[in-house]
Amino acid sequence: MTVKPLGNRLLIKPITEERKTEGGIVLPDSAKEKPQKAEVKEVGKLDEDYDLKVGDKVIFSKYAGTEIKIDDEDYIIIDVEDVLAKVED
């Protein structure tokens, strides 16, 4: 299934990192904070030049957007204004 966001929105895939305590215990998903880093998967028709494209990694507001599932994968549709920074390696 293909999802194309409308207007000033992005489809992003959260990047989750395995979390461990100092003692080496892996924390379950229910104990983790919501991720704030994601990869851009689709870009809507943006009104301005935000210099964002598919494949970019971004930091976004923690509770932004609408969470959806596509083919059993978690994605979020967010407003481009909720992107706080672009991560460059």
From Swiss-Prot:
It comes from the Bacteria. It holds the Pfam family Cpn10. It is found in: Cytoplasm. InterPro entries: Chaperonin_GroES (IPR020818), Chaperonin_GroES_sf (IPR037124), Chaprnonin_Cpn10_CS (IPR018369), GroES-like_sf (IPR011032). GO terms for biological process: chaperone cofactor-dependent protein refolding. GO terms for cellular component: cytoplasm. GO terms for molecular function: ATP binding; metal ion binding; protein folding chaperone; protein-folding chaperone binding; unfolded protein binding. SUPFAM superfamilies: GroES-like (SSF50129). Disulfide bonds: none annotated. Gene3D superfamilies: GroES chaperonin (2.30.33.40). Keywords: Chaperone, Cytoplasm. Heptamer of 7 subunits arranged in a ring. Interacts with the chaperonin GroEL. Together with the chaperonin GroEL, plays an essential role in assisting protein folding. The GroEL-GroES system forms a nano-cage that allows encapsulation of the non-native substrate proteins and provides a physical environment optimized to promote and accelerate protein folding. GroES binds to the apical surface of the GroEL ring, thereby capping the opening of the GroEL channel. Belongs to the GroES chaperonin family. This is Co-chaperonin GroES. It comes from Petrotoga mobilis (strain DSM 10674 / SJ95).
